From Swiss-Prot:
Recorded name of the encoding gene: clpP1
Record-stated family: Belongs to the peptidase S14 family.
PANTHER family reported in the protein's UniProt record: ATP-DEPENDENT CLP PROTEASE PROTEOLYTIC SUBUNIT (PTHR10381:SF70)
Residue numbers annotated as active site: S96 (nucleophile), H121
Primary site of residence: cytoplasm
Localization, UniProt: Cytoplasm
Alphabetical keyword list: Cytoplasm, Hydrolase, Protease, Serine protease
Any one GO cellular component localisation term in the record: endopeptidase Clp complex
SUPFAM superfamilies, per the entry: ClpP/crotonase
InterPro entries: ClpP (IPR001907), ClpP/crotonase-like_dom_sf (IPR029045), ClpP/TepA (IPR023562), ClpP_Ser_AS (IPR018215)
Quaternary structure note: Fourteen ClpP subunits assemble into 2 heptameric rings which stack back to back to give a disk-like structure with a central cavity, resembling the structure of eukaryotic proteasomes.
HAMAP family given in the database record: ClpP
Protein name per its UniProtKB record: ATP-dependent Clp protease proteolytic subunit 1
Length: 196
């Protein structure tokens, strides 16, 4: 069930679902696995907010176990495409594609709440069918793995060799460890007044 908020104004009361109300404050929330549905929603919201005000930052809050690499790359590319800076904030868990999107925020504007967890690993995949089909899928997974590792290396400043080694298996980090790694820039416990 999606919570409803009531807003009163001189023209009476108006009911909003919580996500629509957050969108008015330029807050986008990824609180589920990355799927085609969630990615399409987030891409649409980012494009809407850019059209609404291309000079005002957007805040992307992430609490996601990850999900579809292709759909996540659609969100990633849109984050890089839109003019406003994207602040990313981990609330709870940013794992797999969730961590990749957390790291994709504007430099200096990637954050985590104090007790969140961040996890990176290599893309998961499976294939079945004829040997040639399996080989095609394996080649695609290796291509995507290299692409994600290169982006992580570029955004964190870590050598590609370390990224390859650390993403070979699940690699969990606390927010302070994620700062040292270069995935985020700061950790906060309380939001400054008048800040989203």
């Amino acid at each position: 069930m999606i919570p409803i908020v009531i807003e009163e104004s001189g023209r009476g009361e108006r009911a909003f679902d919580i996500y629509s109300r957050l969108l008015r404050e330029r807050i986008v929330f990824l609180g589920e696995p990355v799927t085609s549905d969630s990615a399409n929603r987030i891409v649409a919201q980012l494009l809407f907010l850019e059209a609404d005000d291309p000079d005002k930052d957007i805040f992307l809050y992430i609490n996601s176990p990850g999900g579809s690499v292709y759909d996540g790359l659609g969100i990633f590319d849109t984050m890089q495409h839109v003019k406003p800076d994207i602040h990313t904030v981990c609330v709870g868990l940013a794992a797999s594609m969730g961590a990749f999107l957390l790291c994709a925020g504007a430099k200096g504007k990637r954050s985590s709440l104090l007790h969140s967890r961040i996890m990176i690993h290599q893309p998961l995949g499976g294939a079945r069918g004829q040997a040639s089909d399996i080989r095609i899928q394996a080649d695609e997974i290796l291509f995507i793995k290299d692409k994600l590792n290169k982006e992580l290396s570029d955004r964190t400043g870590q050598p590609i060799e370390r990224i390859r080694e650390d993403t070979d298996r699940d690699f969990y980090m606390s927010p302070s460890e994620a700062i040292e790694y270069g995935i985020i820039d700061n950790v906060f416990n309380k939001r400054p007044i008048n800040s989203v």
